[in-house]
Regions:
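Cationic, beta-structured binding surfaces that engage anionic biopolymers and membranes
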Residues: 61-64, 76-82, 89-91, 107-110, ...
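One face of beta-strands
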Residues: 27, 61-63, 69-71, 88-90, ...
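Solvent-exposed residues in well-ordered beta-strands and their adjoining turns
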Residues: 32-34, 68, 95-97, 131, ...
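Acidic (Asp/Glu-rich), glycine- and aromatic
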Residues: 83-91, 96-122
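N-terminal, charged/glycine-rich beta-strand/loop interface patches
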Residues: 1-79, 84, 91
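Short beta-strand/loop motifs in extracellular/secreted proteins, especially
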Residues: 37, 100, 126
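A structural signal for small-residue-enriched, beta-sheet-centric alpha/beta enzyme cores
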Residues: 108-179
Length: 179
């Protein structure tokens, strides 16, 4: 495939384990967006966290992104399917220069309800940390278990949810200046 699909925006496809992650797997990805560079980081397909072994050794995916001066990074991976019995940990660490822009999402699907395989056992620990020049701006830690997915105060039985994070350059004025 072409490296540049849209002008100067480079596309980076992370070829994670195509069959998914099992107990004991650990995937660490590090990205540095150089000054003035523009990149879309994505995956060619859904990530998958399969049922853990009986000893519940987790599957861990850790992503570190550093966006330097005047850089732009869109981190838009495909969804992650958390299979019944999975014990996954997803960590995302983002550091953005004061003159850089970051746009990212995470989309999770719990179980395969349509196939008769709901998420009834296991857990997912998801953490997101966003910093500007090393100073923490946002921190989120979630522990999602079947009870959380089903609780009215949780996902109320919905099996899919996503979060979006946008970090604008520090002195960008208004959103329309950037968009």
């Amino acid at each position: 495939q072409k490296l540049f699909h849209d002008g100067e925006l480079a596309h980076c496809y992370v070829l994670h384990p195509p069959g998914g992650m099992v107990s004991g797997d650990s995937l660490q990805s590090r990205f540095k967006v150089n000054p003035g560079a523009k990149v879309l980081i994505t995956t060619p397909a859904s990530g998958k966290l399969y049922q853990a072994r009986q000893n519940q050794i987790p599957q861990i995916a850790s992503t570190h992104i550093d966006v330097t001066s005047d850089g732009f990074c869109a981190h838009l991976p495909q969804d992650t399917i958390v299979f019944d019995g999975a014990f996954g940990e997803l960590e995302t660490f983002v550091n953005v220069d004061s003159r850089a822009l970051f746009f990212g999402w995470e989309h999770l699907i719990f179980g395969r309800r349509a196939g008769g395989h709901p998420f009834e056992n296991g857990q997912l620990i998801q953490s997101l940390r966003v910093s500007r020049e090393g100073r923490l701006l946002f921190r989120e830690n979630l522990r999602l278990i079947p009870q959380t997915v089903n609780a009215v105060s949780g996902l109320n039985g919905m099996v899919s949810f996503a979060s979006l994070t946008v970090v604008l350059p520090q002195n960008s004025g208004t959103t329309s200046d950037v968009v």
